[in-house]
Amino acid sequence: MFVADNSRDTPGASRQMNDPESISEPRLLSRRDQSLRDAHPFKARWMPVAFLAAAKAIGQEAAETNAPVQLQTWNWHAQNTDIVQYHPGFTAPYSGPNSMSSVNEVRETVSLDLYAGLRLWKGAEAHVDGLMWQGFGLSRTLGVEGFSNGEAFRLGTDVPNVNMARLFLRQTFALGEGLEPVEDRPFALAGTQPASRITLTIGKMSAKDIFDNNAYANDSRTQFMNWALMANEAWDYPADSLGYTTGLALELNQPQWAVRYGFFQMPRTSNGTAQDPHYLQAWGMVTEFERRYLWGTHPGTVRLLAYLNSANMGSYQAALETPVRPADVEATREYRYKYGFGLNVEQEIVKNLGAFTRIGWSDGRNEAWTFSDVDRTFTLGLSIKGACWSREDDTVGIAGVFNAAATVHHEFLAVGGTGILAGDGTLTYGIEKDLEVYYDFQVWKTIHTTLDYQLVSNPAFNRDRGPISIFGARLHWEF
């Protein structure tokens, strides 16, 4: 999977879910000032890092010779993330086709992105992201709903694979005279942007780049690794098995609020790589309202999200009504709807300490299609910057996750049904409960390493299995 991410300067920081920074609205110049907040590959050693650093320095030096209002014509960036995870053996009286292995296991993932941006005509930019990735999630990325590695795609590979993850055009229309500074980063060219604006983004991207962002829990490359802590898991957001899709997003942004709408293509099969060509029948729509405010002197943001998907989905109830066992939801597929809602809150409590939560609900009647099997989710966490102990670029995070399935959904799983992540052959239903704690340590400027621990109770909604302890380490660099 995937997803969008915030800069490391953001208190607390994709894809993005293996995503880079949000492409929706370029963040303001000072990312440590929360009051200004708007709103995979071969190994790193295969890339000549010295060359990257030298070229980047030349580009930065050239940019610094220009006046602050000078618009950057083009840019490029790169990132690499390596994650290793291990879990010891755990209690499991039985296993199914989608179970996490109950014996000890080690897996790794590697991602490398090369980003480039070009300013076109007035208000227009084009951006591209070439992704190379390699590796596997634990147990082929199965058996846990709040999966432990946001860099782990369902489409694992032993050798490096290449994909054009993003290729999109962004056009901004000014609604007033006021301007805001924009920093140089992936998917944003240094310069200015209108403070009041309409923004149209069209092309290939991640829906998570634009929607459901959070300053403290958004990016598995620099923050929490758990899927439920980088996105609202009850939002079955449009994406292929790598986390990307084609579509468009329209945004109205004002200094204190924003409204967004997106229309995206859906995959032909559940968590598939090929997109469904029936554009009038297979689509995902999402709307988000964002309100930015100050709580005393501490900034906060509330986002409300609603979505409606249409795809060739099976019905859990229809599968239960057939005599076939294990229950087969694929045999009941026809074009159906799925809808849901989400709440996303981030709040600075005191300087260097922020809190966040996500709450999500979906109807849960029809087949999980793109992200996970979760129908209800609640997450709550804290992010602490290392300035408290004279390590201002370090971060500590701790968060809890509660993931649940709708009644008809877990009844389907109990008679042998399988989903995107769940499928133990049967189950004694229980809410999955996850805990994640991480320490992100700055090694040198843009090079960071992270130690991570996760505890999963009732994995994939099954009280008969687990708990599972998952230990992880991450190396991340970016230019």
Predicted regions and their residues:
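Outer membrane beta-barrel transmembrane domains
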Residues: E290, L305-Y335, F356, D363, ...
